[in-house]
Regions:
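Hydrophobic alpha-helical segments
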Residues: 346, 410, 449-543
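Second-shell loop/turn segments in exported
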Residues: 79-82, 129-143, 413-415, 425-431, ...
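Substrate-recognition/specificity elements adjacent to catalytic centers across diverse enzyme folds
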Residues: 34-286, 291-298, 306, 310, ...
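Glycine- and hydrophobic-rich flexible loops that cap the catalytic core of alpha/beta enzyme folds
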Residues: 310-321, 325, 329-334, 338-488
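N-terminal secretory signal peptides that target proteins for export/translocation
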Residues: 1-13
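Terminal end segments
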Residues: 526, 530-580, 633, 637-771
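Stable alpha-helical elements in mature extracytoplasmic
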Residues: 102, 126, 141-144, 148-151, ...
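C-terminal motif of bacterial Sec signal peptides marking the signal peptidase cleavage site
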Residues: 28-31
Length: 771
């Protein structure tokens, strides 16, 4: 880039300034008026001509009302260059933050508040993953990544004195983008889909502050699965009593909460499906993807919309800003979506440590082994650099080590899948031109670095394939940290990809992925024990089973009034076993003034229609009942826990199958009922009484969507897209917060010249070579 612009590279270290607290990330720009005039210039106009060094001939960018860009060029070089320029103009702050996060360098931008997170990311060492991924990428794709990077850098150079406000207010000068940075972001994306690290650390913290007997009740696997009592009992008692490890566990949990808040590539939960021509009322195949809102509504969604058009490449869909491939989209012949499979290919091991003659050692196979060491330098905004050692055991990097001045104790090591010859980046690139389900199915089997549900559809066929790499575990489910010195819980290589779940053109006519459990207990491959709440998947299956499916099924509708699976499960719980008798006994214990009201509320709940939409009043009462259960069931125990544990437990309940719902659906013998209200029946009646006061105005849409992609092969313009949050992360952009009339509206993303002009009109931003 020095040769391209004739300038020295940006400094690796920001100027010294006061440390910027974490709250800056979520703050508004009030108080930053000094930056406003220049920062506002960081927004690229929608029309006009921009001359840039690096573009060969010309390219055009057009945007619809939601800011979804159409990028047109007569050649692939300028298309990729302009894609880099466009994504940087929309998402530079996100791209820079994610690169620094993956590198373990956020303290350079935000100060000492990020130092613990930087330590964690340096230990995990995603930079090595990115380098390996890039090394295994074909030379032609490496050149494409370099072209894309030059487009990013053209924006960086153009706006070098008028960067977006969050970067401008810290005087941070981002380094130029490198081709390897795209591989680094894909490595961060892969890591974010690959395990339950935060859940395992949460489990250890809960066991340390409560006890191992309560732990399985708080971290259930699935409604029909037994609690992981045996796994919890494998955590050694002496480990739980170690105060130094307890303190370091809390610190690590706090850091992981920080990671979750900052990592926009932590894939959102999503509901997706493909339907065959025989299944749909239109008589054509279709693909639908609805990602759920993971970020606050005012923040942009994790993915960025793109519509690419050149003689060599036509594709439209969702992309990670910084990586010139699609995570979901349509290339003119093939539609595909990649969503979270809730994989668990990471495990935490408790290592027994000691300091011996100036070196750190860990216990393995009844012998003390030296820990591997490497040195890392951390640059901190406003402070002097620090240089620290990072240690690893045979399992992997130590995320916590011995306390200062301690000669022995425990640490936590992270083991995760390591792939030396992975070509996942090339697989994603090849999907952009794959012409059929048959060819794409063969291709995605090589997607080893990215664990995912991949759904495929062409005009005649549909398919589903699970991807990734999964360890074979001895005597463990990977739910809770295991003692590293115990060889009986070690990994034994990786699962055979032949065991990965897949299907093609099933007789039922549809395939779906909604983060649900994909394999039954006892299956020869352990994908995970950390599935999401099955409600979305079960409700979708109920709808898809009704043939033929109308096109309206794919629309991003409010589902808060249609909850057939949950209502059925709760009504069965209330009507089976000893629950009816227990409820009658609990009713008799209520004061007479409440007894009639509780009886009426119970009967109203039993009368809720599972197969029909709820009224506004019914939906509000159901939501109130669920919210009351969630808030009160574990309140006594949670209130006594450190804030970091409470926050982590709340995050876990949002992302995975939650304990409060598991208790409502069953677990009548749980000790938590006694703590909460004396009995489950009494707790349910109290919750019914509370919900009976709910107003119909209190009902809120469930779930909250983030982005929706619809591909209907029966339509002249197959692709439609909707955004529920902004396309840009620049607060001065008109596309950072979408107007109400635009939010959730479906916009076509055409791929032919005739349709393009109809949809986008003739206004363009034209990119030309500099004079």
């Amino acid at each position: 880039m020095r040769q391209l612009f004739g300038l020295p590279p940006f400094s690796l270290r920001p100027p010294h300034a006061a440390a910027l607290l974490l709250s800056v990330l979520a703050a508004t720009l009030s108080g930053c008026q000094l930056f406003e005039p220049r920062a506002a210039q960081s927004v690229v106009p929608d029309t006009g001509v921009v001359r840039l060094q690096g573009i060969a001939q010309s390219a055009h960018i057009a945007k619809n009302a939601a800011g979804m860009p159409l990028i047109e060029s007569g050649n692939l070089h300028d298309l990729l260059f302009t894609l880099g320029y466009s994504q940087a103009s929309d998402r530079l702050t996100q791209m820079v933050q994610l690169r620094l996060l993956a590198q373990g360098r956020l303290a350079e931008l935000y100060g000492a508040e990020m130092l613990d997170l930087d330590r964690l990311m340096r230990a995990i060492n995603l930079s090595a993953d990115g380098q390996n991924l890039y090394k295994n990428t074909p030379k032609n794709l490496q050149s494409y990544l370099a072209i894309y990077a030059r487009g990013v850098n053209a924006y960086l150079y153009q706006m070098r004195n008028t960067l977006p406000p969050e970067l401008a207010q810290t005087n941070f000068k981002p380094e130029y983008w490198q081709a390897e940075d795209s591989a680094l972001l894909l490595s961060l994306f892969s890591f974010s889909q690959s395990g339950n690290l935060a859940e395992e650390i949460l489990a250890l913290a809960l066991a340390q502050h409560l006890d191992t007997e309560q732990l399985p009740w708080l971290l259930p696997v699935y409604p029909d699965e037994a609690l992981a009592v045996a796994d919890a009992q494998k955590i050694p008692a002496q480990v739980l009593r170690n105060s130094a490890l307890s303190n370091s566990t809390l610190q690590l949990l706090d850091t992981l909460n920080q990671f979750s808040a900052l990592n926009t590539l932590q894939a959102p939960l999503a509901t997706s499906w493909v339907s065959s021509p025989q299944q749909n009322l239109t008589g054509a195949s279709s693909l639908t993807l609805h990602s759920l809102q993971a970020q606050p509504q005012h923040k942009p969604a994790p993915y960025s919309w793109v519509n690419l058009h050149s003689p060599q490449l036509q594709a439209a869909g969702l992309s990670i800003a910084g990586v010139p491939v699609l995570i979901a989209g349509f290339n003119g012949q093939l539609a595909y979506s990649i969503s979270a499979v809730m994989a668990d290919s990471q495990d935490v091991f408790i290592e027994q440590l000691r300091q011996q003659q100036g070196r750190l050692e860990y216990l393995a196979n009844d012998q003390w082994q030296p820990a591997q060491q490497r040195m890392e330098t951390f640059f901190i905004r406003g402070q002097r650099p620090v240089r620290e050692a990072i240690y690893s055991t045979a399992h992997g990097p130590l995320l916590t080590s011995l306390a200062p001045n301690s000669s022995s104790g425990y640490g936590l090591a992270l083991q995760r899948t390591q792939l030396d010859a992975d070509r996942s980046l090339n697989v994603l690139w090849q999907l952009l031109s794959s012409a059929s389900v048959e060819k794409a199915s063969e291709l995605v089997q090589e997607l080893r670095a990215l664990p995912a549900n991949v759904l495929l559809a062409d005009a005649k066929h549909i398919a589903w394939q699970v991807t990734g790499s999964y360890p074979n575990r001895r005597n463990s489910r990977g739910l809770f940290p295991a003692p590293g010195w115990d060889a009986t819980v070690a990994w034994e290589g990786y699962a055979d990809p032949m065991l990965y779940p897949y299907d093609q053109d099933p007789a039922q006519g549809w395939l779906s992925a909604a983060n649900q459990r994909l394999t039954q207990p006892g299956y020869g491959l352990q994908l995970s024990s950390s599935w999401a709440n099955p409600e979305r998947a079960e409700n979708l299956a109920i709808q898809l089973t009704k043939k033929p499916n109308p096109a309206s099924l794919a629309l991003p509708n409010d589902t808060s009034r249609q909850r057939p699976w949950l209502i059925t499960q709760l009504q069965q719980m209330l009507s089976s076993g000893g629950m009816p008798t227990a409820l009658q006994q609990a009713l008799q214990k209520l004061p007479s003034a409440q007894r009639s009201q509780a009886q009426q509320a119970l009967q109203g709940f039993l009368a809720l229609p599972a197969d029909q939409p709820l009224s506004a009043q019914q939906a509000a009462q159901l939501q109130s009942f669920l919210a009351q259960a969630q808030a009160q069931l574990f309140s006594t125990e949670l209130q006594s826990l450190p804030t970091s544990v409470q926050q982590a437990f709340s995050l876990h309940s949002q992302h995975s199958y939650p304990a409060w719902l598991d208790h409502l659906l069953g677990r009548d013998d749980s000790p938590f009922w006694q703590h909460a209200c004396g009995s489950k029946a009494q707790f349910l009646l109290n919750s019914f009484l509370h919900s009976s006061q709910a107003s119909s105005q209190a009902a809120t849409p469930q779930p909250s969507y983030s982005q929706s992609l619809l591909v209907d092969f029966s339509q002249a313009v197959p692709v439609s897209a909707a955004s529920f949050s902004g396309q840009s992360d620049n607060p001065y952009s008109p596309y950072q917060q979408l107007p109400k009339a635009v939010t959730g509206k479906l916009y076509p993303l055409p791929n032919t010249h005739t349709d393009i002009e109809k949809v986008y009109g003739k206004q363009r931003l034209t990119l030309l070579p500099s004079k």
